[in-house]
Regions:
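Acidic, metal-coordinating helix/loop segments flanking the phosphotransfer/catalytic sites
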Residues: 29-47
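Short amphipathic alpha-helix used as the core "switch/output" element in two-component signaling
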Residues: 60-72
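Alpha4 helix (beta4-alpha4-beta5 surface) of REC/receiver domains from two-component response regulators
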Residues: 61, 81-99, 110
Length: 126
């Protein structure tokens, strides 16, 4: 499974990358929105994991861009601030799941293993 991980916080990005690569996921990492979009232009991903707050935009913008391009990857938001308003906005932009930081590696990998992007709009789960 090919995963795009977009996270600006270095320690969180490295922790998530280690978590995924140890379980044999192929991971591309980006530190900001623009780099994430650049990856979307060049590669196909089965899943996108994006921080909500990025230095040059938001995870919402990344997922919106992916959906505009017809990308139907599983989309997981990660954030230190899982407020109900965040969940509402995620449902509108195509996130399937929202995970609070620090992300539990086993839980994340179980979502990746069990879930697939659905046809049509995603329903958000917390």
């Amino acid at each position: 499974m090919h995963v795009l991980l977009v996270e600006d916080h270095r320690a969180s990005r490295e922790q998530l990358e280690r978590c995924l690569t140890r379980r044999d996921y192929d991971v591309a990492t980006a530190r900001d929105l623009q780099t994430g979009i650049d990856f979307l232009n060049r590669q196909r991903f089965d899943a996108i994991i994006a921080d909500i707050a990025l230095p040059d935009g938001t995870g919402y913008a990344l997922i919106s861009e992916a959906r505009l391009r017809g990308i139907r990857a599983l989309c997981i938001a990660v954030s230190g601030y899982p407020y109900p308003s965040d969940v509402d906005e995620q449902g509108m932009t195509g996130f399937h799941y929202h995970l609070k930081k620090p992300v539990n590696c086993d839980h994340l990998c179980s979502l990746l293993k069990e879930s697939r992007a659905s046809e049509g709009d995603a329903s958000t789960k917390v």
